[in-house]
């Protein structure tokens, strides 16, 4: 058997599927050489080991050549099997750092055999190294592999268009070299998986799911309406108009929500120069810019108010619409005097100046009777009092004086009663409340004999200091005078006894009603 010329640089492993010459008998070659050379069979087998062919399969041809004179390449070392891994070299370790790790057994075998990447010519496959060193972490062929569930892979349509249409995904498992349907006819061609010169990209880690998910995404995108798509893709807008007066009113009808040109349902700002015609502004939400225009002219307001004031019915309606605290007891009219704030909020107070003006006859045309009730004790009243005042310090005395024979107003004039004591703090206000209470009981609501009651603020002491000319005698005697201690004690006891008897009388009257 003659051996062909051996290459000077490296040895290679070929898988040739073309018709091969008939193999010579192995036994003849071994023993024939022994007879010729005079060597034993074991020695002859050792010498002629590299001259054997057809050992094991008809489609295999192994050529072993020695190239000790040249430096061996990184992928030149191989085992006799042909399907094992190469020994690691300096070039292989450098290439393994540059190429990304890929998954093993990610596609079915039939699809891998039919892939156009496996149908390259023999000349192209010789330009690239086939086998590489696989680390212990990469050697996962014998382990159970489970795909990770893709969350949402990015679509590959963008970068696939820029690639060569004949470029396909790399497959890094050398054990996947399987024949296609052409292997059944007997015409075999060398199958090698070349290394792509292009560096690893995102597609190297593709497991085949991206193509299926891309199709589903395209289908879902076609079914999604444009309005919904605009909600996902439109940017978030957050604006506030500089002028709040330009914003539309609360009850203005919004624009149709079906408009695809507007991402946010908002009415466009109006210009103040050209207001739109045919629009009607709600009166409940006036614009602050045109607030002055909506207010009627002052000349137009009295026309309606005067018509109401001209009739008694209109006057009563206007009075009833006002605050009840500003009306007298029967709600027929307002108070005649200007009142001031005092200790008791439920009572109306007048100042000493108003009292002096009444005494001077300033309101004589409006007042029929002006009654002043001095609620101090008799020794205080004798020491100095207001001209025309009546001293009534007992409640029963006030009731007999005012309610037994009530004063009836005539000609539309008023009957006014003013109460006071030394400071108008306790005795005067208490007497005023008592008269109003008894007057309510004796009349049908809201009618009253004395609807207009007042309390002099500051009492006699303040009035004496400001209006001494209206005091008679022009002097002031306090309640706690040292010369009238016994009188003070006597009147207090009498007032308390009467107050106790009053409470008993009220209790008896309630029991009778039961």
From Swiss-Prot:
Known regulation of activity: Stimulated by B-type cyclins. Stimulated by PIM1-mediated phosphorylation.
Segments forming domain Rhodanese: 366-472
In-chain residues carrying the UniProt-annotated modification Phosphothreonine: 497
Any Pfam family the entry gives: M-inducer_phosp
GO molecular function: phosphoprotein phosphatase activity; protein kinase binding; protein tyrosine phosphatase activity; protein-folding chaperone binding
Region annotation Disordered: where it falls in the sequence: 256-308
Domain observations: The phosphodegron motif mediates interaction with specific F-box proteins when phosphorylated. Putative phosphorylation sites at Ser-78 and Ser-81 appear to be essential for this interaction.
Official protein name in the record: M-phase inducer phosphatase 1
